[in-house]
Amino acid sequence: MVTSLLIQVLQEPAIIRHFNASDWNLLLRQASSAKMPARLAYHLKAADLINAVPDKILNHINSEQVKVAHLHTQVHQEVQALNQLFNKLDIKAIYLKGTAYLLADLPLAQGRFFSDIDILLNQDEIAKVEIALKCQGWKSQKTDDHDQAYYRNYMHEIPPMQNIMRGTVIDIHHNILPVCNDNIIDISLLSVDALKLDNISTHCQPSYVLTPAAMFLHSAIHLFHEGELEQGLRGLSDLDILLSHFEESETNFSNQLIDLAKKINQQQSLFYAWRYLNKVLKRKLSTTAQAFVGDYQQQAPNLATIDFIFTNLFTAHHSTTASWQFSVAAQLAYWRGHLLRMPLRLLIPHLMKKSWLQLSELTKKEPDKINKVDALDPRFHQLDKE
């Protein structure tokens, strides 16, 4: 495993005091590949090291922070409009992930870029909300019949919807794991105690987010069921910042996590979160967390393989971290993610169908492609003359 410079800085920010121009250039490139330039600024500010950053690097980081601030303003505007809609429909929507961090004003929101607004609804409310959104200029991003059926029959969400005017994307969930998953979660155990946020000055209606323990576990479940980990290091950093904040603000937070993980049968996701926060970011765990990790690892399946995957992929996905171990780990993670998402009896037909559709689409385009190539090829005209 190649330890990236970015991880070294996350582990021990003070090392930047000894950086030369080449080190700074590499750090910025690795942070960009991990979608973490603004997050890097957050860590350096928290360590009171921002004054040690060269002006050129600081200018780039500041520009990323401006982009994030603009995004956050847009999200607040979208949420206000969505809340008005949900209020008319008498529906309590729970915001998830990046949007939730922003609405709850968590430290994690600082420097965090996210591409869509994630919402959790009761499954029997989705049809009503989907119709209402379409009336307000939102449309499904997936128009293919196979993709529509895939999402609606097997997944934990409907196809993403995009606003035709503003380009904003909404992911509407009714669970946090695919419904065809063998370890499906009773989502009511997470949503029942959702927190009401009615102190956001720019919003007319209240917003709802998960409790701290549910929020952390959802982030962990999402990360450790993922098959493509280009932003895996950022996901692990999310968990690190959430844990730091909630350990200070909540009483017995480690026990809260363990209790909830047992209720929803996600002890493994909690185990992975604590294990790789410690192994990759060198985070010191609470005594309770250490005991849980020590006990659970005795029964954790395929731990050597899982360690190989995550210790190699929780890094900047950059040319300077490339290795054969990284490539193998990426393939293993890809197929692991597929198998966690769908059982083989569903996965194989799904992949065969997708391959057939892609091949059919390519075949349709191929004649036009060949004709264009022939028309540009001087040899074609020469043969024609002969």
Model features per residue range: what roles?
Residues 1-115, 121-386:
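Conserved NTP-donor binding/palm subdomain of two-metal-ion nucleotidyltransferases/polymerases, i.e.
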